């Protein structure tokens, strides 16, 4: 049964990188024994197929390219079962390279241009809501819509 669990875990990793928590949850959903799951996860870690630090850095890079704010990225990583310490380290490094206010301003400008035919107050509200859904903090979102 352990080899079936290991095979299922490898199939999960074929589609996209995953966190340890995601792999464990998916294998539990497939009703594998917890001992088999632990064995499979340990094997994948030894083979360097599972690494939460690398997954976190990659996920942050992927989501910043979309662009999303750090609040949403952090929430997504927690949902994926990544440890808070790993998230905090990776986010701290990424914040230095990608200031949220700059990203929020550029994104707000692009969104406002698409909403050019709308009443200015409604446009600001829609852009603000958009930025907040994207995970930008309230203060960065307000600064971004100030000159729209």
Predicted regions and their residues:
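An alpha-helical, amphipathic repeat domain used for nucleic-acid recognition
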Residues: 1-148
């Amino acid at each position: 049964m352990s080899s079936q669990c290991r095979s299922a875990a490898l199939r999960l990793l074929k589609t996209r990188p995953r966190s340890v928590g995601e792999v464990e949850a998916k294998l539990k959903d497939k009703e594998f024994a917890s001992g088999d799951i632990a064995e499979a996860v340990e094997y994948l870690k030894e083979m360097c197929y599972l690494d939460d630090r690398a997954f976190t850095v990659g996920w942050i890079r992927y989501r910043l390219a979309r662009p999303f704010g750090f609040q949403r990225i952090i929430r997504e990583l927690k949902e994926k079962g990544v440890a808070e310490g790993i998230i905090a380290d990776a986010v701290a490094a990424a914040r230095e390279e990608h200031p949220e206010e700059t990203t929020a301003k550029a994104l707000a400008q692009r969104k406002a241009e698409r909403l050019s035919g709308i009443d200015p107050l409604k446009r600001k509200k829609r852009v603000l809501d958009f930025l907040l859904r994207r995970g930008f903090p309230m203060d960065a979102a307000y600064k971004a819509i100030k000159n729209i």
